[in-house]
C-alpha cells in the first residue's frame, strides 16, 4: 500500500513545473556563461595560448625579444594572464562542485601549499635547495608567488580527473585511486620541473653537480612531491563529492582541457631544449587524454578560427 506521505501525481507535476520555471540563481547564471565561454573558445584556450606561452617563455629565457618588446620578457602580468586563461576549463568544470566542504578543503590546502613552499625555499626541504629566479607575480615574504595555488592545484586536480577517467570503476578503490593519482602527479612534475628550469623560472643549488642529474632537478625533489601530492590528493578526495565529480566529468567535455594546455606548453618547451624524457612523458599524458576521447571537437568550431576565416 502506498505511503500516506508519498506525493500524489498532481504534486509531482507541480514540483516538476516549479523546477522548470525556477529562475536560475546568480551563481548558476555565471556558471552557464562561463561554460559557454569556454566551449566557444576551446581551441584558443587549450592550443593557442600554450603555444604562445611556450614561444614567449623560451624567447624570455634566450633573450630573443627585441628592445621594443623587452617589456614582455618574463612579464608577470603576461604570465599570470596566460595561466589564468588556460585554467578556465578546469575552473568552469569544478565550479558547480565547490560547496562549503570543498571550500574548507581548498583553504586548508592553500595554507599547506604556502607553508611547504616557504619551508622549501628557506631550508631546502623537502624539494631540495632552490629559489625562484624570476618573479611570478607578487611574492609573499619575497620568496613565494602569491599565485602559487593557481600553479599547484591544477597539477593535482588534473591528475585526479585523469585517474578517474582512465581507471573507471577501479578508481572506486581508495588505495588504487590515491596511488594512481600521486603517480600521475609525479609524471606531470617530471615534465614541469625540467621545463621550468630550462626557461629559468627557478633554479636548484645542485645544478652544477651530479645530484641534479635529471635535467637540472635533484631526485630529492620528487620525494618532496610524493609528500605534497599525497596531501593534496587527500584534500581533493575528501573535499569534493566524487559522485558529483564523475557526473560533471561525463557532461563537461572540456574539463581536462587544462591538461591539454599543460602537455602542449611544457612538452613543447622540453622539446625545444632537447629534454627528451620529459617529452616522452608529456606524449604519454597526451595519449592518456586521447583515450578518454575528451578533445575531439572540430577546429573550425573555434571562435578564433571563424574570426580569421572572415
Task: Give, region by region, the residue ranges found by the protein language model.
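Haloarchaeal acidic low-complexity proteome signature biased toward cell-envelope/secretome components but also
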Residues: 1-54, 246-251, 284-310
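Central hydrophobic cores of alpha-helical transmembrane segments in multi-pass inner-membrane proteins
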Residues: 27, 78-93
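Membrane-interface transmembrane-helix boundary segments in multi-pass integral membrane proteins
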Residues: 39-43, 73-75, 210-228, 250-289
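Alpha-helical transmembrane segments
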Residues: 40-57, 105-110, 260-262
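Internal transmembrane alpha-helix with an interfacial aromatic "cap," most often the third helix
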Residues: 88-92, 96, 120, 125-132, ...
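Interfacial segments of alpha-helical transmembrane regions
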Residues: 101-112, 165-188
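Transmembrane alpha-helix/helix-exit interface in multi-pass inner-membrane proteins
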Residues: 114, 118-122, 183-202
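Short aromatic-rich membrane-water interface segments that cap or initiate transmembrane helices
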Residues: 134-150, 208-224
Amino acid at each position: 500500500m502506498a505511503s500516506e506521505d508519498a506525493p500524489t501525481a498532481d504534486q509531482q507535476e507541480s514540483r516538476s513545473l516549479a523546477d522548470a520555471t525556477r529562475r536560475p540563481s546568480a551563481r548558476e547564471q555565471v556558471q552557464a556563461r562561463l561554460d559557454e565561454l569556454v566551449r566557444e573558445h576551446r581551441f584558443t584556450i587549450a592550443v593557442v595560448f600554450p603555444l604562445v606561452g611556450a614561444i614567449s617563455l623560451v624567447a624570455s629565457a634566450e633573450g630573443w625579444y627585441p628592445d621594443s618588446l623587452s617589456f614582455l620578457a618574463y612579464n608577470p602580468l603576461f604570465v599570470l594572464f596566460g595561466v589564468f586563461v588556460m585554467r578556465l576549463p578546469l575552473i568552469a568544470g569544478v565550479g558547480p562542485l565547490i560547496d562549503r566542504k570543498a571550500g574548507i578543503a581548498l583553504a586548508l590546502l592553500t595554507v599547506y601549499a604556502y607553508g611547504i613552499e616557504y619551508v622549501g625555499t628557506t631550508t631546502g626541504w623537502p624539494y631540495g635547495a632552490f629559489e625562484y629566479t624570476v618573479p611570478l607575480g607578487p611574492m609573499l615574504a619575497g620568496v613565494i608567488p602569491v599565485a602559487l595555488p593557481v600553479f599547484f592545484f591544477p597539477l593535482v586536480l588534473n591528475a585526479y580527473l585523469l585517474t578517474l577517467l582512465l581507471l573507471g570503476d577501479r578508481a572506486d578503490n581508495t588505495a588504487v585511486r590515491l596511488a594512481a593519482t600521486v603517480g600521475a602527479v609525479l609524471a606531470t612534475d617530471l615534465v614541469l620541473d625540467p621545463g621550468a628550469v630550462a626557461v629559468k623560472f627557478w633554479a636548484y643549488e645542485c645544478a652544477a653537480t651530479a645530484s641534479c642529474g635529471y635535467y637540472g632537478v635533484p631526485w630529492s625533489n620528487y620525494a618532496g612531491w610524493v609528500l605534497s601530492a599525497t596531501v593534496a590528493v587527500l584534500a581533493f578526495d575528501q573535499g569534493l563529492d566524487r559522485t558529483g565529480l564523475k557526473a560533471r566529468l561525463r557532461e563537461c567535455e572540456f574539463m581536462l582541457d587544462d591538461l591539454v594546455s599543460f602537455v602542449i606548453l611544457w612538452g613543447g618547451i622540453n622539446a625545444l631544449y632537447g629534454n627528451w624524457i620529459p617529452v616522452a612523458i608529456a606524449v604519454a599524458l597526451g595519449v592518456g587524454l586521447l583515450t578518454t576521447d575528451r578533445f575531439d571537437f572540430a577546429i573550425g568550431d573555434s571562435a578564433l578560427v571563424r574570426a580569421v576565416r572572415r
